[in-house]
């Protein structure tokens, strides 16, 4: 599961350790955008990312009525060459 929220001053994502095809990943194998690490975690339950929109290579798109923040969630296995990505987006009103 993935939960995403944002505002003009922060981007928040909470993920479960099995978000990538039920492969269990450790907190140090999950990254936001340009390799920003997990900022808080409860082992085996969830991992959180909490960053400013200017960090981690988060892209900001200004649309007519809303602001769109775009980034990605990355899995980089420590024990193999397995890599995976999921795009993340969040919208808020101007």
How would you name each of these model-derived features?
Residues 3, 7-94:
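Beta-strand-rich globular domains of non-transmembrane regions
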